[in-house]
Amino acid sequence: DILPVGYAIDRGEMIADPLGRSGRNLEVTYQVYLADYDYLADIQGLFEGSGIQEIEFYPAVRAYAEALDVERAERDFALVDLGAMGVNVVLFRDGMLEYEAHLPIGVRTIDTDTMAAFALSFGQARKLKHEYGQALRSICKNKKLPIPDTRLTLESRDLATVIQSRCEELLEGVIFQLQQW
């Protein structure tokens, strides 16, 4: 995703919105956000498997910016931020913030679960998650995965089972908050 940070007309001062201004030269400062497509597809599959449809992914910055313009929102919506240390659920209704909850368990727990399940260091667990992790065991093709910095391997489906279990727990917390709404 590409997000504009500011604009300058005719090399002038940076402004937030150039609409309605005239000039010969428009400069745009922007920020580029990248995401792992396979990771997003896994997360989308988990949401859809839980019965949640119409899922769109944005960097947190864009999501919060969109949420701040809630007066133009045509429908009620929830903003879910799956963070490393916690999950934030923010609910908007009729253009206003209605409910906000913080769940004190985040996606970093996937690393600690992987450490415990396979007797790995934090670094090894994190590397395995980022290189080979899948959140849906049912679509995981089983293969041997090399454990970083060792000659040992583990089954990809075993890793997917650990990741899926924690992701389901995180999403259950989100769904509970949505049901309270």
Model feature map: region roles:
Residues 175-181:
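Phosphate/pyrophosphate-binding loops at sites that engage ATP/ADP/AMP, CoA/4′-phosphopantetheine
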